Design a protein with these regions (language model features):
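N-terminal Rossmann-like NAD(P)+-binding subdomain of aldehyde/semialdehyde dehydrogenases
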Residues: 1-109
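Conserved small-residue-rich beta-alpha loop and adjacent elements
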Residues: 96-167
Length: 168
């Protein structure tokens, strides 16, 4: 059975997905994923992913500028292209189709289900691109995600996480 990380974490409120401790973030992600799995159908996930994509596209240049300025890595123009690539091309719910396989031994049905809370790290080289890609993939699958961001990109990652949480 699940045991909460801490009693305090049960009532903690993050700042649009940003928390003071990893325990608080994991607890919030666990509770959010359970509610997400129980209360959101595939079409609801599609709506959320669409909102994330639209919001990200509006902020692609800002994300690129913040990333280059904070990390000192990469080229602004390339960061815009990379952000747009993950926003427009990361597979979403369209990959989650039920398959039926029949053969001599009977029928097998393959249906994807959520894993739960997923932990992810972000590299300093592509912090916002990684967050966007992972969020689209993981939310499409009915999961939640907790990011441990690279310290040299923490402000741009904070902005990206909060932007995404505001979009949904």
């Amino acid at each position: 059975p699940y045991v909460p990380v801490s009693a305090a974490a049960q009532t903690v409120q993050g700042d649009y997905g940003v928390f003071d401790t990893m325990d608080q973030a994991v607890e919030a992600a666990y509770l959010a994923q359970k509610a997400y799995q129980a209360g959101f159908q595939l079409r609801d996930r599609e709506r959320l992913i669409k909102s994330i994509r639209e919001t990200g596209i509006k902020n692609a240049e800002k994300l690129a500028r913040m990333s280059v300025d904070e990390t000192g890595l990469g080229r602004y123009e390339d960061k815009i292209l990379k952000n747009m690539l993950v926003l427009e091309r990361t597979p979403g719910t369209e990959c989650l189709r039920t398959e039926a396989i029949s053969g001599d031994d009977g029928l097998t049905i393959v249906e994807h289900s959520p894993y739960g809370v997923i932990g992810a790290i972000t590299p300093v080289t592509n912090p916002t691109e990684t967050i966007i890609n992972n969020v689209i993939s993981m939310l499409s699958g009915g999961n939640s995600v907790v990011f441990n961001v690279h310290p040299s990109a923490k402000e741009v990652c904070r902005f990206a996480v909060q932007m995404i949480n505001r979009a949904i």
